[in-house]
A protein has these predicted regions:
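N-terminal pre-domain/capping segments
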Residues: 1-108, 172
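Active-site beta-loop-alpha junctions enriched in small/polar residues
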Residues: 10-15, 48-50, 82-85, 120-122, ...
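Acidic/histidine-rich catalytic cores of soluble enzymes
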Residues: 20, 44-45, 80, 136-180
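Generic structural signal for helix capping and beta-alpha/helix-loop junctions
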Residues: 54, 87, 124, 161-162
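Active-site-adjacent beta->alpha loops and helix N-cap segments on the catalytic face
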Residues: 59-62, 124-133, 160
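An active-site-proximal structural segment forming one wall of the substrate-binding cleft
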Residues: 92-114, 133-148
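Active-site groove signature of glycoside hydrolases
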Residues: 107-128, 148, 153-157
Length: 180
């Protein structure tokens, strides 16, 4: 720890790339990154949930394995980058709501404070009806997140003013901003 700050890394940066991608959940060898992070004296890893192979990601099916890696290395997980929603936007793919509900529950078990929800590229809020649908979905999920003290941190490609307006429309203290 540097003063009051903790240092961490995005998952996939300390191990060989998965399919040529730096930012990806290293399926099959994700535990190796906890060991590498500990060797570099990093304190945190931002876990990733990709759309591809989401069903075998321990965030959705093996929380005890992540807890074990945390206990063995001392490297924590306080944030999750849910890149899953770039491919399956919450406002367009009904199953995504269930996935986010599971992530919120998993967050409580892991001590995760922030789930980053990308609203960029394929999941960009492209028009008014898309935005309305997103607001409706995120408001209901924000209640659950707030009750469990988890933030839903939005990463959007909106300009600052429309982004602020979106946050006002959502109206939840558990919906925050992530600038990448």
């Amino acid at each position: 720890m540097l003063g009051r700050f903790q240092l961490g890394t995005m998952q996939g940066r300390l191990v060989p790339k998965l399919n040529g991608r730096y930012q990806a959940h290293p399926k099959g060898y994700w535990r190796d990154e906890f060991n590498a992070a500990a060797e570099f004296e990093l304190e945190l890893i931002e876990f990733i949930l990709d759309y591809e192979d989401a069903d075998i990601n321990p965030l959705l099916n093996d929380i005890p394995a992540i807890c074990s890696a945390i206990a063995e290395t001392g490297v924590g997980v306080e944030s999750v980058c849910a890149d899953y929603f770039m491919v399956a936007p919450l406002q367009r793919v009904p199953r995504s709501i269930t996935v986010l509900e599971k992530l919120i529950d998993a967050s409580v078990q892991l001590g995760v404070r922030d789930i980053v929800i990308p609203c960029v590229d394929q999941s960009s809020l492209v028009d008014g009806s898309d935005t309305i649908a997103f607001v409706n979905v995120i408001q209901s999920l924000a209640e659950k997140a707030n009750a469990k003290e988890v933030n839903l941190s939005l990463e959007t490609d909106l300009a600052p003013r429309p982004f602020a307006e979106l946050l006002d429309r959502i109206g939840s203290k558990s919906v925050t901003v992530n600038y990448d």
